[in-house]
């Protein structure tokens, strides 16, 4: 998580073109603040609204006061704008270079959480994605037809993901599903 804090603060300094407007109020984020940011984002998934700004609305019909208690709207949007997990100055050419630290962190946590059992399966999954992305896939037979294709190694008994590969349609997949 400290890497995300450092890279977010660095990315903001690299891209703050002027001290005018909402970026003038930027102050470096902390690990505690990023934890609250991710908690808020998960809470938004549980209480869905049409626009991000609606979570901080004072309209009596759609108000949700918890979001205002966790963050101001402008601070949340600032962190969302500058959130970064990897250094932009790296020479790596992979399409996943910006989220590679997160993927490696998740793989390590998955590996520590569960030991391998006998009943394993490799599953293809499509994670919904509506934005622009160079490796977005279209699979007409899936419920969400457009998204990011994943191959996951799962334990059939516990339903736990042991490892995963994000399909990017690159010539060589550098990561392997079963690590030695």
Name the predicted role of every residue range.
Residues 1-179:
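N-terminal initiation segments
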